[in-house]
Amino acid sequence: MSYTPTQDDIRLLYQRSKKLYAKITLLNWDMKTIDSLEGIVLDGNLSISASSDIRRTFTCNVHIGGRNNVSAYNVYDWLNKYLRISIGEETPRADKIYWYSMGLYVVTQNGFQYDASNHKLSLSCSDLVGKLNDTISGQLTGYATVIKEGRDIRQSIIETLKLMDINKYMVEYWNRTVPYDLEFSTGATVWQILTELRDLYYPFEMYFDEDTFICKEIPDCKDDPVILNHEVIDPLVIRENATIDETEVRNCTEIWGASIDSDWYSADVSFSGNNYTLKYDDALTDFEVKSNKKFSFVVPETHTEGCTVTIVQKNNTYGPFTIYEGTDKDGNDVPIKAGRMLKGKYYVVKCYKDTEKNLRMQFLGQSQVHAMVILSDNPPTGAALEQAKKDEACDVLEYISTTNASDTTGMYKSPFSIEKIGRRNRIYSGSDYENIYTDDLALQRAEYENWKSSRLTDAVSVEMVMIPWMDVNQKIGYTIRSGRPGEKHEPAEFITKEISMQLGSGTMTVSMQRFYPYYPYIIKK
């Protein structure tokens, strides 16, 4: 939720004595206001998480004044209402209450209780994801749901939202199509479908901002302004926790993706002018070259530049087709790199249609999608790198250097290289990883996971005075306090990732990470 603070808002942060209020506006499904309740906050919690499906959850106990209509409502009346919740702050010197929106919510299990004897209202609620993930609704009835290969991902997300009458949305997905049929059994939730669509490519996030569904890239915050600098934040911090969970440090990440089957294997392959010609038996009666068909072969010679493939069967010649191995951010196909397919290795390519319905060939990899990334002070190159690929039994092997002074991802001078702390492996396979269907996507995921697990020194958690309008994925300034005795730290920029506001004490815990351009492959592309 976006909020631009004023000088009055910032001055209010430093007031020692404050009274906290809650305003609960009841709305029907058409977003029409039904009633509004207001009272003094006794205690409660607002949790905001950038990594959770339900981004915002809210619980509170509020003393409601005697003149109210809350006693007229029973638990069933709250089931078909939205709650727009605001927190108000008042100080002895102020002549008004400063109100800040906490978002739009639905009541969850045992989420409404009212004690008329002491006028105490207790609420427990979640943001609108609760309507999609079966917290209160979201399951689909009837036949299984199928999203066909070739459908535009953005449009598929929008159509899925409309199954639950969600008509306010901002879907900023890359120009991509669904790479294979997605099937969902009866009883699947709308959120499960949205999640699988979102995760076809990395890295995207989904959440609700008030009643608007958002799907966009996880922000790198590179061009975002600092909402509060260290001069504002530092005096508000009560204590800091910068401890490292060393068991989570990893410097080698291996991804095992999908197993790739082939429709047609060719044992008769020739190579000339960076074109591979695949010949198939004339006796085959059901042979087809069309979208979604996969063709496999053993490479007779390594190609020295981008290459093509031609398919011959009977008197029919198909191609040559340029082989593409990925897609850039703008949705443009990227031709395969020189030397990507090695002599004597088995590979699979897949026929697909571009946006103009023309046939193209996509490089999938070997029979098993597999990639590995290693953090090293001395990455091998040339013949040494090729030997490392053989030793690791992984052709898609990448080393990240800790000695590159121009690196902006936080890996420069990392203390967690394999030379400094030994090799620490983490292997990802099965479950969602089986949906990673090309080596290129597996490498992107390996880069991301290795980057996350080798930057733990950049994470810090602080307890501080509550800032009711702070949100996750915002850039703030802060000066680290912990370290060796006498060690001085310079102010730095951090990105907020988790916020837990304690309404009873007027404090909050903020987990944040040191700011760097957010993903390694964004830097490269």
What are these regions (language model features)?
Residues 1-32, 195, 199, 217-265, ...:
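Acidic, small/polar-enriched beta strand-loop surface segments
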Residues 2-3, 8, 67-168, 364-368, ...:
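Surface-exposed cap/loop segments at beta↔alpha junctions
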Residues 48-69, 118-131, 255, 453-465, ...:
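Oligomerization/assembly interface segments of phage tail-like spikes and tubes
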Residues 73-93, 290-295, 468-482:
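Short coil-to-beta transition motif at edge beta-strands of beta-rich domains
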Residues 94-105, 342-344, 480-495:
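Short coil-to-beta-strand transition motifs
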Residues 115-246, 259-260:
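Charged- and aromatic-enriched interaction segments used to assemble
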Residues 263-319, 357-362:
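Exposed extracellular interaction/assembly regions and N-terminal maturation sites
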Residues 302-367:
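Acidic, glycine/polar-enriched metal-coordinating patches/loops
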